[in-house]
Swiss-Prot record:
Pathway: Cofactor biosynthesis; NAD(+) biosynthesis; NAD(+) from deamido-NAD(+) (ammonia route): step 1/1. It comes from Methanosarcina acetivorans (strain ATCC 35395 / DSM 2834 / JCM 12185 / C2A). It catalyses: deamido-NAD(+) + NH4(+) + ATP = AMP + diphosphate + NAD(+) + H(+). The gene is nadE. This is NH(3)-dependent NAD(+) synthetase. It comes from the Archaea. Its EC number is 6.3.1.5.
């Protein structure tokens, strides 16, 4: 990848999309992770720091302190307006109002948290006449590794065309603080969760697999070149197929 060209195209994309929408700026969810750090950095490059609001939305009993610290470090480094909103009370009130919540599984609860954050982002975007800028990368989008109408509920996805491993490389080139680049990726939806453990494969390997699938490589070649197991490959392809609905608008019947 030509990273300088990619950087310039993403910046131009953000600028063009916000101009077309006639909005006054952007709201970005800042988790303390590298995807949101890169997205916020590129958005500031496109619009200027005065037009970017960063929202950090931890869950007090779950979000590691280091994530909140890193989110603040990033906001200070960028010089953007920054707010912290603890979602614990909102989620607790929601769960308390639904009797079935006690028997819900952790994925259901995790998705609720992601959708709560989406609602907060849009509240502030509507209030300020701004767009919600998403932080999803190409790896996550292809795998469907995000919450539908949660972190997937955004107005644009500036880094949606670059793989996770490329996110790390572009972030290094932009000088983003190193602690955000080197920490283990996690959606932070439950205690001890990490992306690679949940996926059952490293981002380095899964990006190689996704590239080869896009190029039309045969199964045997993918297994040989990447060194992954057939179980890991099947897991990746199942995710792509099972989550296709996330990458499309809701289907509408043809009536005429």
């Amino acid at each position: 990848m030509d990273f300088e060209k990619a950087q310039n195209r993403i910046i131009e994309f953000i600028r063009n999309e916000t101009d077309k929408a006639g909005v006054d700026g952007a709201v970005v969810g800042i988790s303390g992770g590298i995807d949101s750090a890169l997205t916020a950095t590129l958005t500031v490059e496109a619009l200027g720091k005065e037009r970017v609001l960063g929202l950090h939305m931890p869950e007090s009993s779950l979000t590691p302190a280091v994530d909140s610290e890193d989110a603040k470090i990033l906001a200070d480094w960028l010089g953007i307006e920054y707010r912290t909103i603890d979602i614990s009370g909102i989620v607790s009130a929601f769960m308390a109002s639904i009797p079935e919540s006690e028997s819900s599984d952790r994925l259901t609860r995790g998705n609720l948290k992601a959708r709560t954050r989406m609602s907060l982002l849009y509240f502030h975007a509507n209030r300020l006449n701004r767009m919600v800028v998403g932080t999803g990368n190409k790896t996550e989008i292809l795998l469907g590794y995000y919450t539908k109408y949660g972190d997937g509920g955004v107005d644009l996805e500036p880094i949606g065309g670059i793989y996770k491993t490329e996110v790390w490389e572009l972030s290094r080139r932009l000088g983003i603080p190193d602690p955000l680049i080197t920490k283990k990726p996690s959606a932070g939806l439950w205690t001890g969760q990490t992306d690679e453990a949940e996926l059952g494969i490293s981002y380095l390997k899964v990006d190689d697999v996704l590239r080869m699938i896009e190029e039309g490589a045969e199964q045997e070649k993918i297994l040989k070149d990447t060194g992954i197991s057939i179980e890991q490959l099947n897991s990746v392809t199942r995710r792509i197929e099972r989550n296709e609905h996330k990458r499309k608008s809701p289907p509408v019947p043809e009536l005429y």
